[in-house]
Amino acid sequence: MSSRNSFHAEASKPTRRQIITGAALALGSFGLASTQAFAEAAQEISHAEEAIHQEPVFKASRKRVYEALTDARQFQKVTLLSAAVQSGMAKGNTPAEITAEAGGAFKLFNGFIVGRNLELIPNERIVQAWRVAYWPQGAWSLAKFVLVEQGSDTKLVFDHTGFPKGDAGHLLEGWNGNYWEPLAKFLA
């Protein structure tokens, strides 16, 4: 796996209104009231001045990468290879919970990461309202995964915005050690 990592201070970011409008459009007929986590995310997406941009490349098709990120059984196998589980920080025996539909919730790493899928375009794009358990109540961020075919490989163009200021370094380590590196091992 090769990658390009960065985090940017003062990155351009969507306004709260743009995020809420985009999320509402992405959910279409899925009603905001019926999705508590999404409703909280829409009301309180944080407005940080930092952003993470990464472009890991995986030796797998877009379909395999997409399925590994959206299928609970496959992502559980990725979780078992993660730095969090290997170090004992997270329990590997707690299954990943992922509802693979727009508006569906996910719960990963024993509830340390939770969120809601705002947009799922199979084999192309995943957009999530995403949060870490220790963030202040109502603090949500936006994670966007775009899958780009590169011959027989897949480049994952990843942007993470709206997280609490000061968390970029920790999150960057987490994306590498708990998502990209174990995902590359799983797909190998």
Predicted regions located by residue number:
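Hydrophobic pocket/interface hotspot
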Residues: 65-66, 75, 106, 117, ...
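Short beta-edge strand/loop motif at the mouth of beta-sheet-based domains
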Residues: 74-112
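Terminal, regulation- and interaction-focused segments at domain boundaries
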Residues: 46-62
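Short, surface-exposed coil-to-beta transition loops
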Residues: 51-53, 111-115, 138-144
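Beta-strand/loop substructures that line and gate deep hydrophobic ligand-binding cavities in soluble
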Residues: 131-177
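N-terminal secretory signal peptides
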Residues: 1-14
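A short, structured loop/turn motif at beta-sheet edges
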Residues: 62-63, 118-124, 146-155
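N-terminal twin-arginine translocation
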Residues: 13-18, 29-44
